[in-house]
Each structure stands twice: as C-alpha cells, then as structure tokens.
Amino acid sequence: MCEALVSYIQRWSEGHLAALPDNLMRSQLPLTLFQSLIRTLHTQNQDGSWGSSNSAEETAYAILILKSVACFSFTEMIAAQVETAISKGLEFILTRSQRSPTDDQLWLDKTLYAIPTVSDSYIMAAVQAEETIHKLAEIPYKLVNMSTVTVHKMTEYFSQLPSQMQTPKWVIQASAIEAILLSDRLKTLDVFSTGRPLGEKYIKMAACFWTLANNSDPECLLSTRNIYTMAELSIGLFQEDDLMERSLAGLPDSAIPVIADYIDKLSHATNLCRDPSLHQCLDGDNTPPDMDEEGLTRVKAIRQNIDLWFRFVSDENLTRNTSSSDRLDLQQEVKMATLAATQRARANRALSNGNGHSTTEHITVLSDQNFYTWLHTSAVHDVKSAVVSKALICKIGNGGDVFITAKEKYLAERLWRQMSVEGRLWNDVGSIERDRLASNLNSVNFPEFSSPQSLKLDGDVRTQLLQLAEYEQKYTLSCLNDLTQILDNSGRRTISLYLQMYYRCCVIYNETCAKYAFGSTTAM
C-alpha cells in the first residue's frame, strides 16, 4: 500500500495523474504515510528484526515500508533513524546462516502459512529495493507546509517535560509532526460557529498531547480515528469553556437557576439528536418575570450553545460502539460539567466585584465551602477531565460495558475523580497570575492558603498548591495501578494499555500547565 501511494503521489507531482479530493491529498495521504513510517520505526526489535517471531519475511515487509516512505521523514533526525533501522534490518536478514523450520511461518487471518519461495522473494526485494529518501525528498512538501522551525520548537518544548526526559527525541519530534498533520483538519473546528476558532499554534500543541502520549509506548497504539476525535474533543472543550465563561459572566444571579434547569432537562431527554419535538418541550419558559429583553436574548443564546455542546459530545459517531450505560455515564458527566460552569460563573463574578478579603496579591474568597469540599465537588466537574475520560471509554468500547464488575466500575469512577482533582491542582499551579488578572477563581483564593500558619510552615501559596498536586499524584497512580492490574489479570491488556496512554496524556498536559502556564493563548 505504501509503495502504491508513494508511486501515485510521484506520478501526480509529474502531472501524469489527476489529484484526489483535497482532504485526501493534503491531510489523509501525508498522515497515513508518515504514521506508516514512525510506527514501523517504533516497533523494531533490538536485534534489528520486526515481529514477535524474529521472522526474516516480516522484517522484509518493514524494510520495504521504510524504503518506500523514507521521503516522508521531514527532518534530518528522523531520516537518520530510518537509515539506521533499515541498516539494522538488513543486517539481521543477511547474517542469518540458515532457515529454521518456524522462521517464516506467519499468520494470515486464521491460517498459519509458510511459502519459502514467496518469503525469499520478499527478502530479496527488501535487500535490493531502492531508497526514496533523497530521490523523492521534495514530494511531501508538495502536499503539506511543514515548518521545520515549528517542529524543532515543539520538540524542545515537550522534551523539557519531566515525563519525557527518557523518551527518545526522535519520538517527540515525530509526535510533533503527527500533531501538525492532524491540525490541518482540527484548525477548522468551530463548535459554536462563533467565527473564533482557537489559534493554530494552540491546536498543534493540544494535538501533540495525544500523539506524544500515544507514541511514548508502542505496545498498543490508539487508532488514528480515535486520536483525532479525542484531540477534537479536547479543543472543543476549550472552545466551550471560553464561550460559557464569557456568556455567563454578564448574567444576573437570578438567571443562573434558569440555565441550570435547562441543563437538567436536556440531560434527561432521550434521542436528543433525532427528535425535533424535544426542543419544543425544552423551550418552556421559566425565566424570571423581571428579566429585560437583552437578558432574555442572552439566556436563549446560552441555551442554544448548551444544546450544541451536548450534541457535539454525544455525537453518534463518537458513541456508536459503546454500551447504553457507558453512553449515559458520559451524558451525565457532561451535565455535571456544564452545571459546574454556572457555579464557576457566580464565583468569578464575586471575585470581580471584590467580594472577599483583598490583598496586593490576590483576593481571599468568602465561601460557605472549605477548599477540600469545593475541590472534590464542583471543581472536579468544572475541570472537565472526566468528560474526556468517559468519551475515551465510549470510543474504545465494543458494544458492551468496558468495565464489567462492580469493583471495576467503582475503581474507574474513582480514577476519573482522582485525575480531575490532580488536574485541577496542576492547572491552578500554572495559572495563579493569569486567574488573578482575569478575576477567575483559583485554588489559592481559598483562605486556607493565606493563613499565617500555612504561609509560615508550608511556604507561599504556589508552593502549597504544588505540594498538594504532588500529594494527589501519588493517589492517582495508585488508582490507575489497581485498575490496570485487574484488567491485565482478566485478559484485557489492550484496555489497560489504553488507560495508561490516557494517563500519560493527562500527565503531559498537567506538566505543561505547571511548567509553561499553558493556556489557549499559548504561542510558539
């Protein structure tokens, strides 16, 4: 397939063949060929072979792939890795003195077969095939605009994260390139049709959270479709968060219960995307009688945006392979996250109005909740980490519940909550100053952090928050290990690996929040 696609692109570039539709030429083809390259590179064994049985024939397949798509290396670092991999593969083949009885027995569907003449043909082809890396070096750039400056900046950015210190630099660089290729489609995402999609630089970074987490361990790679939809959801979350924050900021407190009631009704509705009559019953007016025309218009717009958000997250393409209970679980999480946004709007308004004890550094919020209660209730849902968690479960489901027993379901829910708690803390570590300037509620606004005892014994507010984030991180790992051990012991290693990949994605995001104060205004 790789040889055929590269041959087609070459003939097209010479004017001998017509172009395919633009989305295939500019997005799908380069992404497919680049992924073929890096995933083949990533799965080579230490002895230079490929596959679990050290097969010369399977190694020949891999060498043929690398030789045909080497021109899609994009950088000198990856090109050097390709050349080394090909050299090691050829050395493995050429230094074998004899064929063992099981050397080249390969599975084809449900059949174990071995045809020595066919095997020898592939091996000879791999040895003699011409490398395309120099001959076709300009071909990829006729399809995509790959800025090597951006690639190198992203590589340096992510290689400085604690979790990536041991990751080979070429893997980080390959993940950055893969994210850039994915962003060609992601940059058009505008969930609420505001005409204000996120900046391309931010989108590339958000996509790289997923590609880097996926590529960091090649044992079980999430499909391109799933990686794309999860990156799409992550970007959609930032659009929703920004829009809801701006939309709710100017509403009077009397309008918040109206929005909350609509969210509650919407979450209990069935066949949301397919039943137009549903919206008639949801449009029942319970707005305060004293609300002016402008307020009514804003409430209506917020309702419409909430409707769009529920549709986006619960789209059939996202959840068609999941069980009804996992789908319901996701919908309920979206409800709780959206309700939490209304509570945050009230808290932010209180901060903006100076409703608290002000110092030169920050305002200490006046609240009927202590910090722990707030963090483990509304803040857990407001961070929306569990929405992403449960959307991923819907993506990897295969018709039945992903988690089967009561214990598994309990541990999974505990893990989502724990990851949300930890994520909120890391997010607040990196956004103390940004939140202060924007009058957004941050963990350090709670009085526990500014008490004389806390400041004296545990350090400034950022240091205190950092200590709590590190404390919660230990319990997240404990929850993850408990759940993955059960999955491993019950023959569901693939699900276990997907969860570990997702946790790596969260760690990468948390580290960027703490180290770089990452946000939707991040530029590179």
Named regions from a protein language model:
Residues 64-65, 146-159, 259, 414-418, ...:
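Eukaryote-specific, cytoplasm-facing alpha-helical/coiled-coil scaffolding segments in long proteins
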Residues 11-20, 69-78, 316-326, 393-409, ...:
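Inter-helical turn/loop segments and adjacent helix faces that build the functional surface
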Residues 1-35, 43-91, 95-138, 156-313, ...:
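An alpha-helical repeat/solenoid feature that recognizes helix-turn-helix modules
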Residues 18-20, 34-43, 58-61, 65, ...:
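Active/binding-pocket-proximal capping segment
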Residues 84-102, 106-113, 453-475, 480-491:
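Extended charged low-complexity segments that act as oligomerization/scaffolding linkers
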Residues 293-422, 426-433, 499-512:
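All-alpha helical catalytic cores of prenyl diphosphate-utilizing isoprenoid enzymes
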Residues 462-468, 487-524:
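Acidic, carboxylate-rich catalytic segments that either coordinate divalent cations
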Residues 371-379, 407-417, 432-483:
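Divalent-cation-assisted or electrostatically stabilized phosphate/pyrophosphate-binding catalytic cores
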